[in-house]
A protein has these predicted regions:
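Solvent-exposed, polar/charged alpha-helical surfaces in well-ordered, non-transmembrane soluble domains
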Residues: 38-41, 45, 67, 121, ...
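Active-site acidic/histidine clusters and adjacent loop/turn architecture
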Residues: 16-58
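Cytochrome P450 catalytic domain signature, combining two hallmark sequence patches
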Residues: 73-85
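Acidic helix-start/capping segments at beta-turn-to-alpha-helix junctions
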Residues: 55-71
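Low-complexity, glycine/serine/proline-rich disordered segments
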Residues: 1-22
Length: 168
């Protein structure tokens, strides 16, 4: 017989999506620690559903890349962008991401003139809902694009040298 449109199967709201809208983000997610890959996918997709088109700009980072960032504003020019030395950043273990909102100007990062700062608060709140610790809550150097795996804050897994021993 005849099937009415209401009889057709509708996708369930609990359907798990395995990728995001953005191929650059998807490639970076694959390099993250397996423990947070789906969390990041869910966060990015939920943000998009709420009108925030986010791209992961940084995920897993080598100690050398971390040293280059740590040097900014210290031994090289520019402003300080991190307080994390190599080995002490959650990025070094694939447990953190930095995001940018892709807007009409292709890459407004919340630091540019004219950006609605309240959007970062909304994005930060959303990240926390997905189980991340938000860099916007850092006490010393606010890092609104930064999100890291929250459970590690509770587990106190840093060794005496500050490294995240569990993920070395």
């Amino acid at each position: 017989g005849d099937t009415k449109p209401s009889d057709q199967k509708k996708p369930t709201p609990t359907e798990v999506r395995t990728s995001t809208w953005d191929r650059y983000t998807n490639a970076r997610i694959q390099k993250l620690h397996p423990k947070i890959r789906q969390m990041v996918i869910n966060f990015i997709n939920d943000a998009q559903d709420r009108g925030y088109k986010l791209r992961v700009t940084s995920g897993l980072r080598t100690f050398e890349e971390q040293q280059a960032l740590y040097s900014k504003g210290r031994t090289t020019g520019g402003r300080k962008v991190t307080n994390a030395r190599p080995g002490t950043s959650f990025h070094n273990y694939g447990l953190a991401i930095d995001v940018v909102e892709i807007g009409p100007q292709k890459g407004m990062d919340g630091f540019k003139k004219g950006y609605d700062k309240s959007r970062w608060d909304d994005i930060g709140k959303l990240g926390k809902e997905h189980g991340f610790f938000w860099g916007g809550d850092f006490r010393s150097l606010s890092d609104k694009p930064h999100f890291e795996f929250n459970d590690e804050k509770k587990l106190k897994i840093r060794g005496p040298n500050g490294l995240l021993e569990k993920y070395r």
